[in-house]
């Protein structure tokens, strides 16, 4: 498993000085015009390619199994909801800084960045860089977002994003010149670069030239009023917010820096994203990227995605596919002209159980806060049987922790309380005072109720119910009855947030391959959506306005460690903090992981090149396909 990212590092290189990317002056390289744009250039509707690129573009060197490509083609993919067009900002993965497959942070949209004491960040933009409509991309776009959006009480009533605050305080933002801007905090902000490299980043810039027309401080009041009425919104701020969503990519008029731009106004069942003529990357032969002219996203019913993929109706597909579809997909390869790659999932656990330590029921709250109970429930699960039954034994069996791909992986954390041992589980439950049993052999709570755990599921993964039924069978051996309640994601989460759900099932942490420089907030009670402690997370996120203060020693230690990490500017110290937090999770079993590295089917057309056969399917870090740069994928016209 450790070799997957290493493979990617030699074959799918990311952006920046530390990779095989190099930057050269535009006048030193003969750039090639994408054929689809030549008529617009000839007609004078579009500048020539050398005028569209930054003065210092990003030159992409393709090595290993990758090769420079040719222009042309439209890539087809399927989405289950129209709002999933946001994946184009994920897959495009044009970021100020981005992760390499070896998990280094390097420049992308930025020419360079300087860091002092982990609290002073100077960002250098590429001179001559342009938005997709040809307008200059400069520090004015950063100033506008900070002063007129993030710090505007009408547009941002809660103030700037939490990621921009350190100990509740914002940075000093200094515009040095058109291509240089500096952010200075009084204390370290080790998450600043990471937050800009995520699948869903904090976009700290906006196309000011476009959005100012909707802003009360810049636009014409009569024009804004007319636009508010036409859009059927309540105010200029509502209009501005609707027009401004860099992540969702649902406004075709909003300029972008991604490799493809939306040309379809919602609602629609088919969305076309065409090439960005001002995209900043170029291959070694002088071809401006992307190679592919357009990406077509078709909305399809989720249950039909496997069949449509099997029929060859998509060129690149992962969404809507599960491991259970792999056999059928492999069977259609020859007939429909595609390959099925299997990438391990990058989450800390594919399936995980979340006992709610904040549940309202005082008896259950006391039960779940006893580490012996959580450990017993973990040891009462036959992970090997689940792996064989659902994943042909190909997944990794262990607890909720980082995967072997991570430099922070420790086998002891992965294995602790993760082996199937009904005898030990029974002993732990007895020691926890749950030794009384009813006539049917089920354990009784202290008030005489049967120990029946209702596990709530969103039912989005077809294998989830199968997994829970297998858990139910082995828990019965330790005197615990598991009942399954299926609802929707929102209903399940809201019941957990309100303290009504006893236990929920979800995946583990999105980032199962973390390094010490990545924010460990998800390991501490900082978020409501960590379903083991939603009310503690609420308390942190609302500064004590709602939820409950942490009142469990081990959880309090996690919070203290998180604060230490945030204040540290020393890598080794951060590593020690991460390892201690992971150790606490393994010992306490706050989240009961089952299996990880489940293989994700990736359907790839035989005509499509530069998609790595071996990869890691990770939301953060990785942006799923994003880290492998679809702008470098290309179609072979001879196939």
Language model features with spans:
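Detector for C-terminal structural segments
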Residues: 58, 208, 254, 260-271, ...
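A structural "hinge/loop" feature
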Residues: 63-90, 109, 192-201, 364-366, ...
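Extracellular/periplasmic solute-recognition and catalytic clefts
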Residues: 149, 153-159, 173-174, 261-274, ...
